[in-house]
Swiss-Prot record:
Similarity section: Belongs to the TolB family.
Protein name: Tol-Pal system protein TolB
Organism: Pseudomonas entomophila (strain L48)
Classification via SUPFAM superfamilies: TolB, N-terminal domain, Tricorn protease N-terminal domain
Gene Ontology cellular component list: periplasmic space
Amino acid sequence: MIKRLRGLLVLLCCVAGMAMAEEKNILVTSGSDRATPIAVVPFGVQGGSVLPEDMADIISNDLRNSGYYGPIPRQNMISLPTQASEVIFRDWKALGAQYVMVGSIVPSGGRLQVSYALFNVATEQQVLTGSVAGGVDQLRDMAHYIADQSFEKLTGIKGAFSTRMLYVTAERFSTNNTRYTLQRSDYDGARAVTLLQSREPILSPRFAPDGKRIAYVSFEQKRPRIFIQHIDTGRREQITNFEGLNGAPAWSPDGTRLAFVLSKDGNPDIYVMNVASRQITRVTAGPGINTEPFWGKDGNTLYFTSDRGGKPQIYKQSVGGGGAERVTFVGNYNANPKLSADEKTLVMIHRQQGFTNFKVAAQDLQRGSVKILTETSLDESPTVAPNGTMLIYATRQQGRGVLMLVSLNGRVRLPLPTAQGEVREPSWSPYLN
């Protein structure tokens, strides 16, 4: 749907031939200062048991993905302590590490008891210690938990490594035979499970704030309709059946309302539905396309994409009515708005004046400056971690749709492992614990 709307917006803008908005703000190219060096030493495993995954490696990758920390490569480690008494601080000072984590794992009867400790290398003081237990099949959960605890202790920001992600894959077997699969995985693409399969497109999956329900668009009736699905049971409810476009669902912060796009009255406009009563209220009106709503934390403000000024730009408007206020001014295309957790940063799909590529960018809402976050092109569907430190987006590499993870500070850019086929439409979960 985003691709279709992008094409429609661009086409309308070209036909209109209207002058581009004045570039009032500043464009900043992405820079990258050095991340804080940290060493996550391989955890010792009692009895030499072989575990299905490397817990320390998962923790290290989590901390790296945040963009705050740069893990010391294992091949550079001078010593490999597994408990506090074995830490030789001069080894880590020689490597320039500011923090070092050690840990040990005790397997017993299909369960794991994990102990860990984190040290400040300069002060030689312990800053965090803890333990966690679970089944072998929960190894990744425990690793993400330790990374969450460590990240919050060091930064004061709640970790988002135990969250999940939704995305859609499309596998084409022949001209008229494509299988679409809605998947849920760890935020890093691991442990994907199938929530829905269809021979018709699935678009715009979105987690509810409780993390237990999702909304999405399905074409299973040969036309777009919005569904709500309960993750645990798989129970589904169709909630729209209007003529024309039914798309771009977005949950309100309290989970009681859905904003979405309908074209039943002519142009695509944004409506809000009370999920319990199914009553809808129209929010936007007038000429042009209004689409891709995203809620502010106050539950009263909607950010959205509109071409009302001649080119796709981002606006905000009260759900209760009133005029829309334009938010973006840099570039001749800004769409698909997402807000960081503190609502100081607007993440969007952006095209610079004079360029043809679409990139993920972040706008400082106080200063108005815009920073390009990605080095790919044809980017779409950015989704931001609940703590605002990372984002995932869809793009194309070597002719295939893939997902990429980027830290908002610009230090980390990496592809996520996903299933075969075209991968698109990522959506980050809220905190789940």
